[in-house]
């Protein structure tokens, strides 16, 4: 049957900002859905608050609303479309993660969908409830003959205690309707139960938690299934978790297809999965079901299901080449599986289940170094911030590739010094899962532990441990062989070992370069295989490749000759991490699409399964490979060979994928690879403070005084000369890694000890820190002659808070025309001085009317997508064209850039866009269960961002806060406790809050100052003060935890007692999920946002409408 003809207009809800537990995989899913629906002739309206996504580009929907994803704002969008005669017929919420699903449930429950006659498609309200509600899902499992863990849904702490008494400790606590395992965990004691169930009841939208028997240590599996309205069901992929139950699947290494299932177990799982899917009632879309198997007796239970496209769906799509989100969207509008053609073979229908003749391994990327004090134990609450995926012809090859894809500083086994430990100590470590468990398993085996001992200690299946044991045996062979011959080297490469790993074992080969030279002499190169969904039964029409070192020297590569068009290789950004997220993938995708249109053949290299760039139809060719020098060079050789006789490889783009490809630029150029755009030498010049300082001196541009130090003595002398506070940081980092504001010599000494370990080959930078300065961010283009200012952003927080964590406004809200003109002149001088061809990001600080240059990055920045959305100018597309020879004048003529003016000449009535960072503090706790500090500083900690856009700053800021944190309060009590230096600045914002009807609560010193300024307030004591002696009975922390505070304003003190008090206050605010503002500027912005909300004139506006207003 063809698609439903009664559907003309579909609303798609995106997933909002990148969060731990809900990341870029939903940008990938939503982008696919929007493309499919529009291709089918449907009108598509999209709501998503995340400007960094491809799906919020205006060309992917007819009406794109970058607005908060709340029931209220979604209703405003539905109403606006209805008022304009564009009635929305259906809502597709299964492709936007838990955020979209929860919003759809709320819209259904509050009657909005019924009032506007909007149908839920993909999964209806009842199906969502049956799949998401723990008790209803458990009843369904029982009904179809399956078994669940013994459990009970509890709504109160009394019910929780009663259930724990029946089941016995330990138990697992799981809230309903949350994502990434938020609020869940293992409770070993009564105290654990009280704490975790309390958090769980607070974090569950339905205010209930599931208390279940512990199945920790069992083997975990997942099935990805799809069903159409004719009841056809396919199992797309089976996935096995390397780690046992107890580690969230998002934090586990996972393998596809499942490796250790017996055929009988798989068939049982498959039958159960299909029966559950039918009973839940997901009739037109995909779902993910998780199972656990007891390795001792084979008992199989069903854990849970997601009645939507999930994180695992993105992984399964990339692993198999079966586009789950795309097919789910087609099923939702009425197609059946047998009517949908497989994109890769162009012959088989989607009802053919994919067959894999390779192994896929996904590994998580963590960022514990960003959160000092956070407990790094892996639990049922997800903590990883990104992931990498690799494909190989066997498990151990894929494992080796994925380990070097993670970019943690270790390129797999044997590339870092071993810890000093005994075999018993390592085995004991393995009993507590951490992010270093793969290395611990290999080390324990190398120290003499048996496969059985390691499997028992770690809970990892003996089959996986045995695979790593085989690698340990191969290591011994590599160390002991008198000569490294072709047979042994080929075996090592077939086992996933990199040249760098082999070089670490054979010092006589003089490093990675020597190993590569030996391989070339022996004719050992990878062959590139194709992902074809059918184990080569049909020919693949889509070039989606992975490398493998086959044992058979005669094995042939499957890269088809392509000699017609010049090729451009685009290096992606690798796994998401704090400091390098999907903003960089966004730029890579734009480069691929625009260069294809301009007549180039685009080749994407990346290893991140969450992203749009690794979709098989984003670039003309995709290599799912690690972004290392060795792997990229082999792809370059393969592409050069496949293009023989034609124009060949025009160049490699390293400027768009963040620090990862930039770090490869110099070595690639030395190996003869043509780098397009800004040269590696110019990139190095901008990073080298001495050389960059010379550029600034020549241009007459001031910069904060600084010095370079390799010892503490040097750093001490520089700091004493410049004057404290100073900003210290290593060079060549992204996301402010290792950056600190230092107020005294003692702290400086501790920092230098750590920092020199962090980056031994580069000196530490010691800069004067400009307190109370306005920070300014600029994105610009340069074609070598002309400079085009893309956008000038004014940070809301003062300089000193990492730009990635600071909210910012575009156009600037307090800068004058002369300030903007100074910024333009400085940016032009830097672009020409460095030699930029492509994108440039410059950060400035404005203090006492002097514009200081903080740093310049000749690459795409994380603000490029935000600026592009706010100004209607596709900066990444323009950059890609410039790198391959187009001029700014030419791009103005073509309409890619504004015909006149640029981002520094915005109209006076232009709407204001505010970007706000989204921070993951609620995910991380200390080992004792305490919250980590939410104080911002020069090291980046945010995982994602949102955008608010409106006709004035207050309204735009209010939207950004609603999108990021669930809105600013409109009434209630505001608690204020600030450092002495901030008291004068905060009088007016707090006075305005009091005038708006808020009650004010403050600690003694702040209360006294507020009363002197005519602001009535109640007093509470500081957390570390005892009650009595004239002090109030309640402390600030007690008031917050009691739910009596709607917002906190707390600026940090020095390093004394009050600083500790500030930590407790901020931690309490995070745990109660209320706004916590830590800067004076943030407080002023919040007041403007609250005023705008209370006025009630905040509307919604599509990007298409906004861009037509801007004249683009």
UniProtKB/Swiss-Prot annotation:
Mn(2+) 3 binds at residues 843, 855. Belongs to the CarB family. It comes from Mycobacterium sp. (strain KMS). Keywords: Amino-acid biosynthesis, Arginine biosynthesis, ATP-binding, Ligase, Magnesium, Manganese, Metal-binding, Nucleotide-binding, Pyrimidine biosynthesis, Repeat. Residues 560-965 are annotated as: Carbamoyl phosphate synthetic domain. Residues 138-333, 693-884 form the ATP-grasp domain. It holds the Pfam family CPSase_L_D2. Residues 966-1112 are annotated as: Allosteric domain. Residues 966-1112 form the MGS-like domain. Residues 408-559 are annotated as: Oligomerization domain. Binds 4 Mg(2+) or Mn(2+) ions per subunit. Mn(2+) 1 binds at residues 290, 304. Mn(2+) 2 binds at residues 304, 306. The gene is carB. Its EC number is 6.3.4.16, 6.3.5.5. The large subunit is composed of 2 ATP-grasp domains that are involved in binding the 2 ATP molecules needed for carbamoyl phosphate synthesis. The N-terminal ATP-grasp domain (referred to as the carboxyphosphate synthetic component) catalyzes the ATP-dependent phosphorylation of hydrogencarbonate to carboxyphosphate and the subsequent nucleophilic attack by ammonia to form a carbamate intermediate. GO terms for molecular function: ATP binding; carbamoyl-phosphate synthase (ammonia) activity; carbamoyl-phosphate synthase (glutamine-hydrolyzing) activity; metal ion binding. Mn(2+) 4 binds at residues 855, 857. Its cofactor is Mg(2+); Mn(2+). This is Carbamoyl phosphate synthase large chain. Pathway: Amino-acid biosynthesis; L-arginine biosynthesis; carbamoyl phosphate from bicarbonate: step 1/1; Pyrimidine metabolism; UMP biosynthesis via de novo pathway; (S)-dihydroorotate from bicarbonate: step 1/3. GO terms for biological process: 'de novo' UMP biosynthetic process; glutamine metabolic process; L-arginine biosynthetic process. It catalyses: hydrogencarbonate + L-glutamine + 2 ATP + H2O = carbamoyl phosphate + L-glutamate + 2 ADP + phosphate + 2 H(+). Mg(2+) 4 binds at residues 855, 857.
